[in-house]
């Protein structure tokens, strides 16, 4: 079908999606999008996944996008359909996930009349998206869809909303191909200033105590960026740490990886960040969970910040050398210049630095009490790690809370795009739909949602989606009967006053899985853990595992609110309440 063909608005949308390479849409029908659903019914190229809630549609699209490198596509109706999607859109915005969300709207002549299921979708989603559109002319529809995909995936990725009135979907208009629809005003800088890259290489070569600080921007750049990062880190011999969103950008099995940094990061990663003399930040944004007390953040280091989004530069932390560009281009130039100038690290200084780091490592900050009396959540994850170790096709999603931090600490990620979590917004209910999206994108893979018994209930209805489409996703619940992270902070900072953090009426998750048509498993003893995990993996259907873990276990190490990296606490013997100043409590 060539450019200039006359189609209905709904047909234009489907044709534009096909031309953008879309094979899957996550959505929920309603009156304002029925013409689009009718056009979907008449074709066989794009698969639609019917979720049970519009928030889950966006999270599933996020999981699809994050695990595949493609743009996730969402289709929802007007009014409550659009407003239900907002949480997912903000989540995608904060974690830089490319999403195109199509929303229905009341007919153009009714906009502003408080019509049935009308809301100001563009007004509501303006702060929740990278960009949004309201299309009132069917002849602008194809151009808008193509432009939305370009905006969503270029520069710093993010969600884009296209609001489409119902009469525009019925109207006939001219179809335009992607090549005719490129925006003229939006051209993000992807190639860096070479003079700055050369300066960065000089700083890198002359450093005595350097560290690479890597974020999700490396993963968003694509697999080549992760390969280049690994090459540069190994060439220099320098240590590397990653943020929560950067897990997998550098292989976890490599001795140069110090683990995750930040509030619940490793002792060695945080102290290396505090004590370094050169910090090379690649694709991270110096957020508050990483920096701790800003005025004492890595006080003696020069800081290089590589980011595709210029608005991130100097936003939270003042840096010495900003480099705007795509991580892959910048890393490629750094490697080329390092080789061309025959650069070498100061091996004597580097040995002293590594000796110090290995001294910190010897503290074994992730140690926990080993016992046969109760299942420790860390133990459950260690056994899960052992069970999935032989496989390379494993994708882990999480909900939000203690289980999320333990998963980040105890599950190693050696490749990008295998770790799916809500980092910026911290959205409970993210993990199950994200696992569904990952399973759709990777049909033969093992997709596991590590969950808490509180978080999983936010979008538990999506088990029905998994069963409808015969998706063998696994939900691995660390059930401690509490909102774990809330309880932890109430214990440590609020005098053990557990205000509304205990779940008194939990469902029987084994029976719940059975009610959905899936498989439910439970472990209450240490001796049962391995068998339950093995059965979960071997079962070719959706599974919920109820792993009954220690209800009082807290997540350590941790940096108390308002404290610096070198003031982190390693375990319950450290007094958190005494270590946290009053001004720091507002940062929790």
Regions found by a protein language model. Name each.
Residues 34-108, 110-117, 226, 267-287, 314-316, 405-483, ...:
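Thiamine diphosphate
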Residues 13-14, 18-22, 36-40, 356-433, ...:
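Active-site diphosphate/adenylate-binding microenvironment
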Residues 103-144, 166, 246-355, 533:
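Glycine-rich, acidic loop regions that bind phosphate or pyrophosphate groups
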Residues 11-22, 63-69, 93, 151-156, ...:
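Glycine-rich phosphate/diphosphate-binding loops that line cofactor/substrate pockets in enzymes
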Residues 147, 151-206, 365-366, 570:
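Conformationally flexible catalytic loops at phosphate/diphosphate-handling active centers
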Residues 2-4, 139, 175-177, 202, ...:
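Phosphate/pyrophosphate-binding active-site segments
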Residues 66, 217-304, 412-444, 457-460, ...:
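Glycine-rich, anion-gripping cofactor-binding loops and their flanking helix/strand elements
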